[in-house]
């Protein structure tokens, strides 16, 4: 039987919530997924993220926390990547962040994280004022020197290739900060005896009951913001700092 979001939640302890750090996403999920090794929790959803409007994605996710949902997808190599959906496009904002993983006592650059904001409509020339910015955010994680991705054991995406060197497996975190948090029942830490590849245990699995919120098209949250400049003055950089601070507060 195919795994569905409802079935995935039903198999988790009451109050399960998924809240990994950037390093844990890279080491325990993206690296293991590209190596065809089992991940910590079953089935982060495989889907063509770039061909689906963001408000359709939350209902397709197996796991998430607060405003976040996680997906594996095949993406074109960075230079050829196109991120256009039926209703709009994902626009990069801020600066790329290198994710370091501790190996052999040294911090090794392992992946790159990049932030995108979803805009309704078609691409506009750089520097133009675009009033169709929404509240949908995507953080895209790519391995540096990415190996060829393996076919998932179960996937709704039939196009995932094994031998196309123009594409690579990436992990996407989709969120909408303007949407209300889902209802939580518990507020305690779920500890596991098994230890992750990074040696600190799976302490990012939190006991907080989560029901996927209804995220529909009217809630896209259009704003009047011009973020054409992509540098240290970009609002995305401040959001990155806030995002990193929140991860540290959760033990990342």
UniProtKB/Swiss-Prot annotation:
Residues 110-183 bind DNA. Disulfide bonds: none annotated. It is found in: Nucleus; Cytoplasm. GO terms for cellular component: cytoplasm; nucleus. One of its GO terms (biological process) is regulation of seed development. InterPro entries: NAC-dom (IPR003441), NAC_dom_sf (IPR036093). SUPFAM superfamilies: NAC domain (SSF101941). Residues 234-244 have a biased composition (Acidic residues). Residues 12-177 form the NAC domain. Keywords: Cytoplasm, DNA-binding, Nucleus, Transcription, Transcription regulation. One of its GO terms (molecular function) is sequence-specific DNA binding. PANTHER family: NAC TRANSCRIPTION FACTOR 56, PROTEIN ATAF2. The NAC domain includes a DNA binding domain and a dimerization domain. Forms heterodimers with NAC26. Transcription factor involved in the regulation of seed size. Binds to DNA-specific sequences of CLPD1 and OAT promoters in vitro. This is NAC domain-containing protein 23. It comes from Oryza sativa subsp. japonica.
């Amino acid at each position: 039987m195919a795994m569905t979001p409802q079935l995935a939640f039903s198999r988790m302890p009451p109050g399960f919530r998924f809240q990994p750090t950037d390093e844990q996403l890279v080491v325990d999920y993206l690296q293991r997924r590209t190596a065809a090794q089992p991940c910590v929790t079953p089935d982060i959803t495989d889907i063509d993220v770039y061909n689906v409007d963001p408000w359709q994605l939350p209902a397709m996710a197996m796991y998430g926390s607060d405003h976040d949902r996680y997906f594996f997808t095949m993406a074109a190599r960075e230079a050829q990547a196109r991120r256009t959906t039926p209703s709009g496009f994902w626009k990069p904002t801020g600066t790329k962040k290198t994710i370091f993983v501790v190996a052999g006592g040294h911090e090794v650059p392992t992946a790159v994280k990049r932030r995108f904001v979803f805009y309704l409509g078609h691409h506009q020339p750089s520097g133009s004022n675009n009033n169709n910015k929404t509240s949908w955010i995507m953080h895209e994680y790519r391995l540096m020197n990415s190996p060829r991705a393996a076919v998932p054991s179960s996937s709704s995406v039939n196009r995932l290739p094994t031998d196309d060197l123009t594409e690579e497996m990436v992990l996407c975190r989709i969120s909408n900060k303007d949407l209300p948090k889902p209802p939580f029942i518990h507020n305690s830490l779920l500890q596991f005896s098994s230890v992750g590849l990074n040696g600190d245990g799976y302490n990012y699995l939190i006991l907080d009951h989560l029901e996927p919120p209804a995220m529909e098209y009217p809630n896209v949250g259009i704003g009047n913001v011009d973020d054409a400049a992509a540098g240290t003055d970009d609002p995305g950089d401040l959001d990155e700092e806030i995002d990193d601070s929140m991860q540290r507060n959760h033990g990342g």
